[in-house]
Amino acid sequence: MYKEIIAYLKLKYGKVKPQSVIGKIIAKNPELKAKIKELIPIIEQEIKEVEQMDIEQIKELAKAYEQTIEKKEKDIEIPVKDKVITRFAPNPSGLLHIGHARAIVLNHYIAKKYNGQFILRIEDTDPDVKKPMIEAYELIPKDVEWLIQEKPDKIVVQSDRLDIYYKYIEELIKQGKAYVCLCKAEEFREYRNKGLPCPHRNQSIEENLELWSKMLKGEFKKGEAVVRLKTDLTHKDPGVRDFPIARIVENPHPRIGYKPVFPLYNFAVVIDDHLLGITHVIRMKEHTNNAIKQSFIYKAFGWEEPIYLEYGALLTDMPTHKSEIRKLIEQKQIEGWDDIRLPTLIALRRRGILPEAIYEYIVKDVGLNKADIKVDWNKIYYYHKIRIDKQTPRYFMIRDPIAIVIENYDDIIDKFEIKNGIPYKKISKHPDVDLGYRELPIKEVLYIDKRDAERLKQKPLRLFELFNIKFVGEIEIEYGDEYSKTKEKAYAVRVISFDVQEAIKNKYPIVQWLPEYEETTLFELDGYKKAYVEPNIKENYVHFIREGYYKRENDKWIFSVK
């Protein structure tokens, strides 16, 4: 829980005293002053663990702490008139990922800071280009609710509102501000690029209403008719000149079935933002060009525009594009949208990452600005660990076990309590003893990881919470019965002392060990692996010492955070 502070102090001063760590903790969390006595053994244990880390691990932990103290906390401020109503408006063609988290959190945080409302609006009026995933209608609200830890004040689905859009399109036609264009795409493009009106621009209102009625009845095929807003034919951007606001769609919508006419994105956005009372549109800077078209629509209706605030992208090296994820799923390279190698919110939830950690990272470290920012997973992990560590039991895990045989076993067994004729060691599950203990039998043959066994040849090791051992030599041991025997390489060792201070003074590596093990499967960011853990683990979220935090899922352990 406090390893980041310890690593920072170790790099800065070399030696770390518990009092120095406590000073840093109390400065940030004054309420812990009354619990100093409880903190000291926890900190002492974590100092021991950091002392055994290699320099790169220590630097990584220290960097996470440095970033939290270098960046002064700056709250997000926005211009406010009366009330604040914001919205997060995803397209359901895929599921939400860490990049969407910036939009969700900023919109929600700002709304709640100013006692306003936060609306989730699912934008699904482009079924040809962005075909909706039917399951997204259930999973997107679930993801949003998970991240903000409450239900949105309102959930709106645009495909439920087609009649509303039709009403306002007809209103513009009746006011002579919109018309039905029957030009082929290339014909209109030629008029537009020359700044000339197409032949349909000056049709009478009656003619346009009749054509509009035919569009709604499905009498036109795709591309034969669109509704255009009258804008500025001399506008410097040809794409703004009489841009379309509604078009024919022939394919059935996955959610509502066949509807001949759908509004285009910018029109539906303006109608909804106005009718829902959106006061602040907080969106990615890539939508700047849309603002020009939306402004023309607002002016056509005589409506006041909301306040626009823009932010940059939240980038990651993991796949986020919907088409890329779909391809990986089809190729069976990943299991689905919740594969933990993805940065989707459903995958992060599967890993057991706390939504509060992501939320705090967005508010404190990402913020509302136009800079594109690469996701700092270590910071998200840090915010997660400061919440979860104090309630997470610790266990041993070995990735590649090798047996060690204790030569002087008979000389040491009287140091342990005996249960059913077998000596055992009672080890706390956490520096906070309230989380309980587990009892591990002490046998003549124990197991350590092969990477630690190689170090044993160079200098003594300390088995965590047990004793110090030295290398004697390589041997072979036999497994099996009289019918089937297997020989296996092992290391003969001797117990040289039980003194932990001796290990610290002489810098013996402190390593994990197992008296027996249970083979399990790990699902990590680079795929599936085998590992060996203590048997009879009851909890579903644990900290495997030196390996990270893992969440149980059926018969395997899912990687959570390092």
Curated annotation (Swiss-Prot):
Gene3D superfamilies the record matches: HUPs, Ribosomal Protein L25, Chain P
UniProt KW keywords: Aminoacyl-tRNA synthetase, ATP-binding, Cytoplasm, Ligase, Nucleotide-binding, Protein biosynthesis
Subcellular localization: Cytoplasm
Molecular function as annotated in GO: ATP binding; glutamate-tRNA ligase activity
Motif ('HIGH' region): 90-100
Keyword Protein biosynthesis: yes
Protein name: Glutamate--tRNA ligase
UniProt source species: Nanoarchaeum equitans (strain Kin4-M)
